[in-house]
Structures are given as structure tokens and as C-alpha cells.
Amino acid sequence: MVGDRPLWNRPSLEPITTVGLLAGTTSRVRFIAILVLPLRNPVILARELAYSDFLSNGRCVAAGALGGDYPDEFFAVGIDPAERVGRFEECIEAMRYLWNDEPGSFSGRYTTVPGGQIHPSPANGRIPIWLAHRGKSERSLERIATISDGWLASWVTARRLGWGVEQITKRAERFGRDPSEIEVTAVVRVYVDDDYGRAVEVTARNRADLYGIHSYDENVSRAYHALGTADQCAEKLRSYVDAGAETVVILPECPFAEFDDQVDIITEEVLPAAGLCLAPIPKEAR
């Protein structure tokens, strides 16, 4: 999973470029590119995603985010933050049009395409578009249920995830859609340490450094992160699966110097304790 932060306090790799690089050096890993869609030109983005997906043999997922937490990013690229919802929804519609084999034209409020398609097209004709939301608002749940291929849930508790899955299921059925078509993925930040209090402190300080602020609410770490011993972390991860997550994306929440060690501990101790395994190969890429 690669995030999208045009302006950030730490080095941050651009998602499309990174996926393109990794596509040429791997053969099984699925890539989730988190993209703040209102900041992107739909035509250019559709082209970049299609080529990355083609080169990776169908291993790309586009996770669209609304953005808005950092208005300066919008101002920096000449976009009015008030337009973000309209641009977000139109970007999804325009990209799906461009991946369609049938020629035609697209005319929206912000994007007009006189005609033409993207070639080469995505490996399987289209790329899954997930919505990266906390699922707080009625409108965001409605979008997930009606126009998305999946929900990438970040910064939610397991309880909130379960509630969101129930709400999305109801809305999808009301819309006449099979809820099983909507893949649910939870993003959980993990830090393994035998001292739970230290784990809370380290992760809170790490987020404060990342956001460039003096302090970070430790209650956020307690609520959303998997912290403590391997068994404690495993129990927290398992709670997301029990709440309805089909996949859990694990992000080591630690200073860079500890990253490799945390990955080893998570892989060797936490995942087995949680009864989880590394993600399988997508069916279309086998």
C-alpha cells in the first residue's frame, strides 16, 4: 500500500511511480495505491493506472480518497477544496469510461473527453476502485455501497468496522447489488513491544513527528493501533477479521530505524499468533 501526500513532513514516495517500479521487480504482490482523487487529472490518472496494471498483470488496486484534511494541498495545485466531492465522484466515472472498450465521449462538470480509450487497457479490462474512508458519513457509506469495488477502512476501530460493514451491506442490497462484490480491507498500524505503555508513547510520538506537531493524542494510538506484545497485537488484528475485514493491511508504526525489526517480529510472531497469513495472489494474476 502506497499513500498519496503531495506535501508532507517526511520523504514520501509518489504512489503511481512506486507501483510502476515494484511491478517490474515482483510477480505476486498486489499493490494498493491510495490516491487523493480530487487532486488528480482523471485522464492522466486513468492512463497511469492502466499501464501499471498492464505491466503488473492485473495486480493494481486504486483506493480513492477525498482528502480535505490538508487544504494547502488543494490550494497548491489550484483546486478549490469545496469541489472535492464532485471531483472525486467524477474522477471515478471518467476513469471507468476511459477503461471501457466501447468508444464514445464523456462530459462532466470538471472533465470533458471528446472520445478515445486508454491503450493498453488494464489487464482485466478494469481496475478495482476502492474508497478509502473512515465510513463516518451517510454519503461515504452510500458511495461505498453503490460505486466502489471495496472499502479501505483506516483509522477505525474493529467495532466501527463491523458497524460500517452492516450499513454498507444494507445499502448495497437496497441498491440491488450483491454485498459480496465489495471487498473490505482494514488498515491497522502495529508496534510490538513487551511494554504496552512504551508502545503507546512511541507510536504517538512517531505520529507527532510525521504530522509536524508538538504532541499527538495517545488515546488515538490506544483506539486504532495494535500495540504491546505479539499476542496483544495478534488479538487486536484478529478483532478486525472477526468484524468483517477480508484483508488486513499492516503498517509498522515506528521510527524508520526500527522498521526492519518490526517487520520481522510481525511476520514471525504476530501473524502466526493471529492465525493470519500473507495475502494470497489475486485470482486474476495467477
Question: What feature does the model see in each segment?
Answer:
Residues 1-286:
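Active-site-adjacent structural elements that line small-molecule/cofactor binding pockets in enzymes
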